[in-house]
Amino acid sequence: GIPCGESCVYIPCLTSAVGCSCKSKVCYRN
């Protein structure tokens, strides 16, 4: 539920390496 400061509209979350996932076009972590 914490925004990772990255969008995932056109590309996947690069922050997925630290546990972030794409939700509603924005990368979130928990």
Curated annotation (Swiss-Prot):
Detail the disulphide connectivity of this chain as listed in its UniProt entry: C4-C20, C8-C22, C13-C27
State the source organism's domain of life. Eukaryota
Position of the Cyclopeptide (Gly-Asn) cross-link? G1-N30
| PROSITE patterns (alphabetical) | CYCLOTIDE, CYCLOTIDE_BRACELET
Q: How is it modified after translation?
A: This is a cyclic peptide.
Keywords (A to Z) from UniProt: Disulfide bond, Knottin, Plant defense
Keyword Disulfide bond (UniProt): yes
SUPFAM superfamilies documented for this protein? Cyclotides (SSF57038)
Gene Ontology biological process terms, A to Z? defense response
Tissue specificity, please? Expressed in petals and roots but not in leaves, petioles and runners (at protein level).
Summary of the function given for this chain in its UniProt record: Probably participates in a plant defense mechanism.
What is the similarity comment for this entry? Answer: Belongs to the cyclotide family. Bracelet subfamily.
Swiss-Prot/TrEMBL domain comment: The presence of a 'disulfide through disulfide knot' structurally defines this protein as a knottin.
This one is known as Cycloviolacin-O10
Q: Which organism is it from?
A: Viola odorata
Lineage summary: Eukaryota, Viridiplantae, Streptophyta, Embryophyta, Tracheophyta
